[in-house]
Structure formats: C-alpha cells, structure tokens
Amino acid sequence: MLQGQIYRGVNETIESVVWISDLRRFTRMSDEFAPPVMLGILNDHFERVVGAIAAQGGEVLKFMGDSVLAIFPVDPELGARPASRAALAAGLVATEQAAAGPRARGEAGGDEIDFGIELHHGTVVYGNIGAPDRLDFTVIGPAVNQTARIEALCRTLDRQVLVSQRIAEGTDAELVSLGCQALRGVREPQEIFTLPEFA
C-alpha cells in the first residue's frame, strides 16, 4: 500500500478491519504512579499488543496516549474473512499475553493491567495527513469513527474484546452476541459481539 510514498495528501481508499485498544483506568494509574513508572507500564503493554498484531499480519499505525490504532487490510480477492479472523486471533493472543506477563500494577500494589479491544470492518482512507513539516500516517473515515464509538462500550459491557456486527456477519469465527447497543453518532442500534472467552 502506497509503496513507501510519504508526501502529504497521498492516500488510498482500502477495505480493512480496524483495531482500537486502550488501557482501562489509565487516568487513575497516571495519578498513582510517577511518569517514569507509567512509561514503563505503557512500553510493556504496547510491546505485547504490537507483537500480537504483527504476528497476524496487522499494521500498527499510531499510539494515542494509552491507545493503539491498527488495521488488518482486506485482500479484495479473499474477502474480509481472513482479515477478520486474523484480528480476532491477535485480540485473543494480546489478552492472553497481558494476563500471563508482568503485572506492573500488581507489583506496585495495585490491580493487574487491564485493557479493551474494539474491532470493526469497513472502508477507510489510508495515507498521510498533517502540516508540510510534520506528517502523520493514519487511517480516517466512518469505520474508524464507529470503532471508537464501540470503544466506549468496553467499560459499559465489561468485556475485554468487542466486535461489530459487520465483522460478525463476515466471519466464521464463534462469537457471542451482547445484544443491540446504541452508539453515539450512529442512527440505529448495532448488535455487538464478543469472543466466547469473554462472554
């Protein structure tokens, strides 16, 4: 994609599974721990998440505070199923590694690291945006916005992985419905799913 072009305005419209994940209780953790400790927690967390995404063929685009934005591009010849399956597998691995890894908060006397993952499938614009001397490589579009809306439900539904109806309709993976949920800015309620491991 884009073959390494880095000029502002260069972009490509692609179909992709969008991944957004973020730490829970990040604000409280930032108040409890000194900045160097928080940096260590974030780096350890990001290393595990990025490794899980990359192992399944995903591409991490950016870190936004405690959040990760990534995509699993859809091959037009294969359809969305392989990308959806890869994103779901990465989500499961990331949560397993977080549970088995060092518990930075536990070692400091608090709870273990907890984070949520949200997955949605749609069309995105993939490319460079920003000022002439400061470019940001990212994806934008309604699919990204809806993934962010689903992110807010992780705390409400108390599930670590949430999957959109669009992905559920295009995958053969086993998923569990959490019912129809209202998403801010989306006209109709959307059915949301999770993996059986988090039902």
Region spans (language model):
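A structural signal for short, well-ordered beta-strand segments
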Residues: 18, 68, 115-121, 192
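Cytosolic regulatory/linker segments at or just downstream of nucleotide-handling modules
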Residues: 124, 147, 153-199
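Short, conserved catalytic or interaction motifs in soluble domains
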Residues: 28-31, 35, 58, 74, ...
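Juxtacatalytic helix/coil linker segments
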Residues: 1-60, 64, 109-111
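Short acidic-rich active-site patches of cyclic nucleotide enzymes
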Residues: 24, 59-60, 64-76, 122-123
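Alpha-helical scaffold within the catalytic cores of cyclic-nucleotide enzymes
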Residues: 43-57, 74-117, 142-153
